[in-house]
Amino acid sequence: MKAVVLALTLAFVAGQNFAPEFAAGKTYVYKYEALILGGLPEEGLARAGLKISTKLLLSAADQNTYMLKLVEPELSEYSGIWPKDPAVPATKLTAALAPQLAIPIKFEYTNGVVGKVFAPEEVSTLVLNIYRGILNILQLNIKKTHKVYDLQEVGTQGVCKTLYSISEDARIENILLTKTRDLSNCQERLNKDIGLAYTEKCDKCQEETKNLRGTTTLSYVLKPVADAVMILKAYVNELIQFSPFSEANGAAQMRTKQSLEFLEIEKEPIPSVKAEYRHRGSLKYEFSDELLQTPLQLIKISDAPAQVAEVLKHLATYNIEDVHENAPLKFLELVQLLRIARYEDLEMYWNQYKKMSPHRHWFLDTIPATGTFAGLRFIKEKFMAEEITIAEAAQAFITAVHMVTADPEVIKLFESLVDSDKVVENPLLREVVFLGYGTMVNKYCNKTVDCPVELIKPIQQRLSDAIAKNEEENIILYIKVLGNAGHPSSFKSLTKIMPIHGTAAVSLPMTIHVEAIMALRNIAKKESRMVQELALQLYMDKALHPELRMLSCIVLFETSPSMGLVTTVANSVKTEENLQVASFTYSHMKSLSRSPATIHPDVAAACSAAMKILGTKLDRLSLRYSKAVHVDLYNSSLAVGAAATAFYINDAATFMPKSFVAKTKGFIAGSTAEVLEIGANIEGLQELILKNPALSESTDRITKMKRVIKALSEWRSLPTSKPLASVYVKFFGQEIGFANIDKPMIDKAVKFGKELPIQEYGREALKALLLSGINFHYAKPVLAAEMRRILPTVAGIPMELSLYSAAVAAASVEIKPNTSPRLSADFDVKTLLETDVELKAEIRPMVAMDTYAVMGLNTDIFQAALVARAKLHSVVPAKIAARLNIKEGDFKLEALPVDVPENITSMNVTTFAVARNIEEPLVERITPLLPTKVLVPIPIRRHTSKLDPTRNSMLDSSELLPMEEEDVEPIPEYKFRRFAKKYCAKHIGVGLKACFKFASQNGASIQDIVLYKLAGSHNFSFSVTPIEGEVVERLEMEVKVGAKAAEKLVKRINLSEDEETEEGGPVLVKLNKILSSRRNSSSSSSSSSSSSSESRSSRSSSSSSSSSRSSRKIDLAARTNSSSSSSSRRSRSSSSSSSSSSSSSSSSSSSSRRSSSSSSSSSSSSSRSSRRVNSTRSSSSSSRTSSASSLASFFSDSSSSSSSSDRRSKEVMEKFQRLHKKMVASGSSASSVEAIYKEKKYLGEEEAVVAVILRAVKADKRMVGYQLGFYLDKPNARVQIIVANISSDSNWRICADAVVLSKHKVTTKISWGEQCRKYSTNVTGETGIVSSSPAARLRVSWERLPSTLKRYGKMVNKYVPVKILSDLIHTKRENSTRNISVIAVATSEKTIDIITKTPMSSVYNVTMHLPMCIPIDEIKGLSPFDEVIDKIHFMVSKAAAAECSFVEDTLYTFNNRSYKNKMPSSCYQVAAQDCTDELKFMVLLRKDSSEQHHINVKISEIDIDMFPKDDNVTVKVNEMEIPPPACLTATQQLPLKIKTKRRGLAVYAPSHGLQEVYFDRKTWRIKVADWMKGKTCGLCGKADGEIRQEYHTPNGRVAKNSISFAHSWILPAESCRDASECRLKLESVQLEKQLTIHGEDSTCFSVEPVPRCLPGCLPVKTTPVTVGFSCLASDPQTSVYDRSVDLRQTTQAHLACSCNTKCS
């Protein structure tokens, strides 16, 4: 029956107004409660929040206008263990808000929809938002004909998708309505972001896991009444969860529960208030003072000036000697106080503190951190009034740019600054302000849907004016500003200066084009499609400079191109002729193809497909070609990632790159940000350093060279590059600074430096240091991070997610001088040299940093939040005393005891819930997130809401849940994990112990995930403390230089005995020897004992015949006296020193047999491939006559080698020892080394030149440490270093002895252990020549080495298996020789053969190809320059020079391409020249009638002719012949040198880019400096590494064959009377037959010049050449050389002509 009644009721209501209504003349009384709590989901943990309880009076005030009043409101704070602890009434806060809460508000309400809200001005925005939270419950959009539907509905939090569900309760005849609002699906979501202007949303990251989710459920019980429905009950349950990581790793929650229960209807209306009601918005939340309020502390401002004064005093007083642990929080308090200050207040504070140095410093550092317009205006006004320095202004502006919230008012202020003369006059400030202007526009546009074009128009206009005036520096600056702003309207302005074909912008300098392309990247973030099209157009333009195309590629891939676009680029790369562009694009796509799917999913997939198209061919290009590297990592579980990208751009395959860019990107919590980017252009750095300082601009030089090149057909010079180095820095995608360095700037800086009285400043600083000392304190506060997101809850209370990080760094330096004798005030340097100076310094660097992560409620009157706080404090004090006596050569440094805190560095991380309110500023209710005591699981009856004291049937519905249930449940018990570890390391010598301690109590026992592991408390600390019983009084280092150095040595070495002098006399010495010999005898059975050397000596003696035969092989050093192998057993040192020679010449017979058989069987030839390793048991024979194969025989210890190997070894030995002929005079042989050691094992005190003592002085005056003695024996060219332990009970020491046997050989013996006897090794290094190639050998032999070396070697070999290392590990086998030899032979300037012989007699041969040239001639002492500076200059230039050569009628270009050059008779060809307008050099080549080559070199005003004459090569300089031997020395006026070299002559002019021109009767060779690569042209090519575009003709066209290319570089004759006897001219030839093109008869002319005889001459020598022809029906106006090619045909080119007398 009830169901029927309800059905009839619903049917009746469907025809009526189905919306809540409140009848006029009645007052509806409701009870309202709201509880907002934040914390982790589990019960038994701490939460913080706010509770609101009140009665509501609701009545109609007018038609569709209602009045709402709160009665007996009560606010309660919650900070405790939920649900055990109760909320605490905030009586004072309630009383403070009571006057506002007592004022009723009015609102429009029509058909269940809340409209405008009205309230008096006395009602604050905060209280009005609480009303909005109540009105949100009344918002009902009920449709008459639908039971389930959704719509975008207005609510407190914005306009979000809301799902309605309507049902009926047949038992009580009520309507049940539920609506669910998805806060992640909103048309308009109300929130405010602060400090997040530079972050971007990572869409793909958010697809995998949502970091911020929210949903609101509202459940209603509606009762049908006469004309509408009445709300009986309403429950609201909202959940907002935030996960800093992935959702699987835990999330913190903010829960809001509201309840509204109908109580009664009163007939008395709500009493009216005498106040003016104003329109105060709508149902939507309104942001207010919470934007300025930090969530870390509440400050009740009663007397702002006094509070500011107190905080400033605290910061200035307590951060001098040490940084106070609360300094960061106090700094944040000062920020908060100044953030709410008006400009007038700041002016008042400034006048009060500007003359108080520490207060002024703290004040100026805090103002920019406030991020307010008033603060920015204050900085501007003080700078304009010159009350702050330029340094203070620059620092303040840089900080303010990134802290100030951007709005039109702030942008206008920056606009006024850019016009200020004071800013324009200072380059640094001008740059900061202009770039800041662009940043402000960018920040404002990021948060505004429609960003006004007017904001950026001033810069666009400036750019247009600068282009019109050709002001390059200003153009670059304005482009950077537009790039920072990233406004889409700037796209048109930037397009106008792009190097698009056919536009006027093509003529602009390339630096402008570079900046314009890079400025597109920020625009691409908003208009990717538009930028994408332009970038692709630039990239596909093959005529564009390669660097610009590569930059376009960077921009293109930052726009997230589609699969089709990436495929288009890949197909373009397949046919790309420029290898720089191909290499860069390929490497870029390859790097992106490996990117994780989360970071670049679409681009990575597209690039993976592109890699399949391209293959791996381009992988073989070397590092001289441009590359892009992208590396990224993303952890989905933590939702954290990082990416790093590096672009290496080159355009001429030079040794140094033209430019590079490196940038990093971070991913965290679903957002991404470009953290840091650094770029540099060093294109002109080499040229700036190595180029001749000033080229002569004389008319004669320029005219001569231009006259020559004018003869070339359609000559077009390359643009002259301006020597320039530039660097820029970007932070969060915004350029914050850049610098362009060129020659004028350097000259200006040098001039400025000369004008400054630097010497005077230095003298005054030295006087201040030595007379009065230094006492310096400095502190710097930094607000490193302030990132906030504020969003309203359904109850109208704002919640906040924020991250704060503040730090205060300080340093205290105090230096006290003491001089003896005391210096006068006007002392000079001479006096100082005779003064004993002592300085005592105490240094205390300190830092304190606080970091807060907050989630909770934040208003200007109350706060309740969950907080994670990390406090870092670090102090590293040091006290040092230094003493210097230059006259005596004494230096002493002491580290003195200093007060060290318990922990040098400590960090405490705690998580807690906190609640506070403004009326009780000294009361903070803090509850640790994890309870400190384990909870007892006893049943607790929870607090039951009084809204429904009796359970009724309505509560049985699953759709409606009361705010707090009555179920009795035990509170869960958690056993929280406690973890503590301590790691210590101590050093007895210095008496200190260092400990790292870690203690943690976390919630991993609740859930073993990241968030719960971080919850709780954690402590990290690092301490350094004295060791008990080993306290050190001080650490000392003493240095003594000079003849009296030995006086400082603590331990003396006996000059006649092997032992140290010890107390006890000779008896103890003899006893020591006896015990030592017994120890040796007892260990004779061990292979590693010292007696093994004796057994090897005996084996060596028994096989003397084998050794004598083997010793005939090359030994790089003079022969060793064989008697050394049988030296007395008493002299262990002598035995050890000779072991290397004896072991290298002796081996077992089995080893010899194996070596012989292996040698005879290994006859395979070795190739010259780079780094190919041949490993054999003996020498590998090679099919080619190479130094590698010859040197392989050096290592054969066998006497049964083949005769050919013996002959080769003997031949190589003779060649190698050519440079050792002069060694005999110095007496440097192996036997002399033994004689030197035998004569005097230890050098005496008179040879000591340096003594160094390192010691620690203990509290009981004991000294421990080491001494180092440096001895020099000049007559024998011997150096000895002895390091000894100065403890009386220790005989440990290191002995190193080096003897220079000749200028080509040095040997070193190193031994260590007890009395330098336990371990020893010999190292011999020598140089020589093998097959005319410089060579060097390093031989290392040892007697015994520590076992730890072998252990570590095994560990390394386990992870990095290397055969050589494996051989070294197994040296204890019977056939091992305990030595290793390495020989390096420079077979050419770019290749080295390295041959290594291991102790297992294995030989490894590696041929290495080097990226640069080895200065072989300089090694041989054949440098063309005598001065050291000139030599260095020459060698640096030569290292990466490009070479072009002519050998046996084949020309090898700079790019190593070869072709046959069919040279014309008597006509010059341009072999190589500087193709820029500077014309630094030119090399011409011709062949005379007798088929002899002539070379002409033009450098500066000098003409050099080299040609064969008789059997020699002759040189003329400016038509004056220089008699042999030709030699011309470089001078400042003559920047070149001519020198005889081998069988010819060589010209050197590296400062002009011409490294070397060598010429003899059969060959010639041209080398250009590395910085000239890409700027040359001629027969030798451009030296740019572009082998696919090798044949560039003078007009820039690429010829299809080498013949046409070579002919284009002929210098034609002007007439038959030309002195050079050249009778050729270059002309376009007509094709003999006519062709029909497009239906018309056309005449065809060659578009490439062809050499033909002059009129009146007949060809006597021709050659066929294929050239391109252009065919047209009529004669066009354009030059034939500019036409396109229609077909290619073969024609005849003339090479030699015969002329008659009529030839003119």
Swiss-Prot record:
Phosvitin, an egg yolk storage protein, is one of the most highly phosphorylated (10%) proteins in nature. The N-terminal of the blood vitellogenin is blocked. The gene is vtg1. Precursor of the major egg-yolk proteins that are sources of nutrients during early development of oviparous organisms. This is Vitellogenin-1. Residues 1442-1617 form the VWFD domain. Residues 1078-1109, 1122-1204 have a biased composition (Low complexity). Produced by the liver, secreted into the blood and then sequestered by receptor mediated endocytosis into growing oocytes, where it is generally cleaved, giving rise to the respective yolk components composed of complex suite of small cleavage products. Gene3D superfamilies: Lipovitellin, beta-sheet shell regions, chain A, Lipovitellin-phosvitin complex, chain A, domain 4, Lipovitellin. Chain A, domain 3, Vitellinogen, beta-sheet shell domain, Vitellinogen, superhelical. Disulfide bonds join C1444-C1580, C1467-C1616. Keywords: Disulfide bond, Glycoprotein, Phosphoprotein, Signal, Storage protein. Residues 1-14 form the signal peptide. GO terms for biological process: cellular response to estrogen stimulus; response to estradiol. It comes from Fundulus heteroclitus. Residues 1078-1213 are annotated as: Disordered.
